[in-house]
Regions:
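Beta-hairpin "wing" of winged helix-turn-helix
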Residues: 54-62, 66-68
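Short amphipathic alpha-helical elements of helix-turn-helix/winged-helix folds
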Residues: 13-20, 82
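A short alpha-helical element within helix-turn-helix/winged-helix DNA-binding domains
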Residues: 28-36
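Short alpha-helical segments that sit at the start of domains
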Residues: 1-14
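Non-DNA-binding regulatory cores of transcription-related proteins
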Residues: 70-156
């Protein structure tokens, strides 16, 4: 499964916002410069993140964007789905509002899709990894090794 640059750049944008001390607003120009990303593309991404309630904006000379919630409360599945839409390992997959995964190939023949089990497991693994990773973890991981906080339960 490949994610597009929307997910990659959007996660990098969110990490940059998470690095800011005191949750002060950050301009998209500053993020574009820090991450070497195209400003026009970031404008498109931040609109999706704002619509999803993950970032807020402040107008004015010292305005910009900031996280709408603490980094510890933002999971990567929220970020990726805000940018990419529902996560599906194959184009033939779609999820019902009840969360049931359906395969369009199952309609073509009078039997269950032969590979649905495999792709459902792939989707579940990806979703668990994204849901189990917070923005705070990525912010901490992005720091130089000597500045990182020890992980909970690790030897100091």
């Amino acid at each position: 499964m490949l994610f597009s640059t929307k997910a990659e750049y959007g996660v990098r944008l969110m990490v940059e916002l998470g690095r800011q001390p005191g949750s002060r607003p950050v301009s998209l120009n500053a993020i574009a410069d820090a991450e070497r990303l195209p400003l026009s593309y970031l404008e498109h991404l931040v609109a999706k993140l704002r619509q999803a309630g993950l970032v807020t904006s402040t107008r004015g000379a010292h305005g910009g964007y900031r996280l709408a919630h603490p980094a510890e409360e933002i999971t990567m599945i929220e970020v990726v789905e805000a940018l990419e839409g529902p996560i599906a390992p194959m184009e033939c997959f779609h999820e019902t509002p009840e969360g049931k995964v359906l395969c369009s190939h199952a309609d073509e023949v009078d039997r269950t899709c032969a590979t649905k089990l495999l792709w459902t497991r792939v989707q579940g693994g990806v979703n668990r990894a994204l849901a189990g990773t917070t923005l705070a973890e990525l912010v901490e991981f992005s720091r130089p090794a000597e500045e990182r906080q020890p992980a909970v339960g690790s030897a100091a």
